Amino acid sequence: MIALIAEKPSVAKDIARIIGATQKNDGYLSGNGYMVTWAFGHLIQLAMPEAYGVANFRRESLPILPPDFRLIPRQVKAEKGYKADPGVLKQLKVIKEVFDQCDKIIVATDAGREGELIHRYIYNYLGCTKPFVRLWISSLTDKAIREGLDNLQPGERYDNLYLSAKSRSEADWLIGINATQALSVAAGQGVFSLGRVQTPTLVMICSRYLENKNFVPAKFWQLKATTASGEIRFTAQSTAKWEQQPEAIAALQRVKDAGQLVVKSVERKEACQEPPLLYDLTTLQKEANTKLNFSADKTLSIAQSLYEKKVMSYPRTGSRYIPEDVFDEMPERVALLGQYPRFAGYAAGLDGTPLNRRSVNDGKVTDHHALIITENLPGE
């Protein structure tokens, strides 16, 4: 029997359908020699200071540096402090039972740093020692899943990715816990939350706010002259600027007294502007914020939804490049958009046109290639 664990129930169901695990059970699907179960994102977290004998915020307890970080089920708020999420405990029990009944595990959590951490934390918390392999795919289309299942990767290949995620998780804990307690104790006026990401971000926001608040606009004047040569009209603007209006008026009068402007030289340049690289998550979030006023979280949420609906590749990518084999498929994918009314015009404009290769570079593709459409049409 082979176990397969996905990051979400929806992904687990898609994979289970393809491998023939269609029998529904409480917390997993089974059939055709497989047992397919799932997480709900992060089921396991690092234990809080209380687990190391540190209660309340006390100066003498700082810094809190656990010799070994302990793993506990995800916590939720209770009347007094926190307690393990009952839904998480139930699913962890299911996952353990599935793992215990199987000879090996296929890890199908998201193919990225956090997806790797989700599996490894569960695996380590349960004390599992079964061998596991990795399903590493960049989209959730049936084709991509089948190809991934035919090319399962050794689990140890992603050990460094796990260690990277583990380091990030522990760094967040060390900075967040110690800085929050230190500032709160020093201030003596309640709890002040600090974090590895949130605090530098808040500093940037505050700095920008103060810059805008203290900005004093300064007036200046320039000269402009509109003229024409044949059918070409253009506006010339002085490179000089005057902070006082009388000085600008005096300069304008000198130009008028001269009677005419003479073009002394013309410089011509040929320029070629390359198209932008394909999107990674960051550039997508920036453009969505600029053009649509979307927050970064909203853009990620939409991208994740499109990924789970199988119309877009894996969203949490840091690469703006695609490999040669993916580029070879792009004319067919663009042509498919011609069947979708909203994009038919764009697809027609690219029909028969060689696609630009600026974003094609196997050497610059990281764990995942740039964001692209899949072979599935929206609405299917």
Q: What positions do the PLM features span?
A:
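Long, highly charged, low-complexity internal segments
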Residues: M35, L43-A84, F192-Q304, E308, ...
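Conserved short loop/turn motifs at secondary-structure junctions
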Residues: M1, I106-A111, G188-S193, R268-L277, ...
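Helical mechanochemical/support elements of P-loop NTPase systems and associated helical scaffolds
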Residues: V11, I15, A84-V98, E114-I122, ...
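Generic beta-strand/beta-sheet core signal
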Residues: I5-E7, A39, A108-D110, T226-A228, ...
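Intrinsically disordered, low-complexity regulatory segments
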Residues: M1-S169, W173-I175, P354-S359
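Conserved, well-folded catalytic cores of nucleic-acid-processing
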Residues: I18-T22, V98, I105, Y125-T129, ...
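Short, solvent-exposed helix-loop connector elements
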Residues: L183-V191, L377-E380
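Extended, highly charged linker/hinge segments and catalytic-adjacent loops that couple domains
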Residues: Y158-L163, L174, K309-E380
